[in-house]
Amino acid sequence: INNHLYYGVHREGDKWVFREWAPNATSIYVKGDFNNWEISPGYRMTNKGGGVWELVLPRRAVKHGDLFKWHIFWDGGDGERLPSYATRCVQDPVTHVFSAQVWAPARAYKWKNPRAPKVENPLIYETHIGMAGEEPAVATFKDFTKNVLPRIAKLGYNTVQIMALQEHPYYGSFGYQVANFFALSSRFGTPEEFKALVDEAHGLGIAVVMDIVHSHSVD
């Protein structure tokens, strides 16, 4: 049920643990900013059985913000892949290729407001972060928090439903061609900026509903 808490990359004590479920792989290497994007023996995952692959690295080997990918070998070929359970992916502004990103800020976000109270009859404002701004650009979590949330509260809504939050490479898909089911779309900002948006909404008495897409993917 909580596979996202096991697979992907996680900081466990003084170590980093990388895990993937890839039953058809013959070998998997982790490569990224921390090893010059090279396929090297020290970054080869261990086959733990049952399709589970794992690599444990010391905490000093990886830092917050590092980009990385898997390099997977299988019978008849090999290639780069993003972790199935990546929680943060970013797009290169030049090549437009996505990489996973280690996301572990030194300080966790500190919530300021309690959750908005449950209401029997929610009045829902449906919105898309990127298209909610008035400027001819993709709006961000910060833009939405500053400019849109106050308007939603003033109009009397008690719930906001946010569309297209999962990472998707094609912006024109409106978020319905999901590539990374466990990652917020980085084009809108950071996870902490999204938490600040939710926090501010709760402070205004507005509940937040995340429109999570399970039935569409890029494959």
Question: Where would I find each of the regions flagged by the language model?
Answer:
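Predominantly extracellular/luminal cell-surface or secreted proteins
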Residues: K31-D33, F73
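Substrate-binding/active-site clefts of carbohydrate-active enzymes
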Residues: V90, A108, K112-V119, I124, ...
